[in-house]
Amino acid sequence: AEYTLPDLGWDYAASGPG
């Protein structure tokens, strides 16, 4: 995925905001 937020430990394009 392209949008990765390491501070939250999630992958936006894979997991989504929810």
Swiss-Prot record:
GO MF, one example: superoxide dismutase activity
Locations listed in the record: Cytoplasm
Keywords for the protein's UniProt record, in alphabetical order: Cytoplasm, Manganese, Metal-binding, Oxidoreductase
Gene Ontology CC terms, in alphabetical order: cytoplasm
Cofactor(s) required, per the database record: Mn(2+)
Main subcellular location of this protein, as a coarse class: cytoplasm
EC number: 1.15.1.1
Keyword Metal-binding: yes
Similarity annotation: Belongs to the iron/manganese superoxide dismutase family.
Purpose: Destroys superoxide anion radicals which are normally produced within the cells and which are toxic to biological systems.
Name assigned to this protein: Superoxide dismutase [Mn]
Organism: Mycobacterium simiae (Mycobacterium habana)
Gene name as annotated: sodA
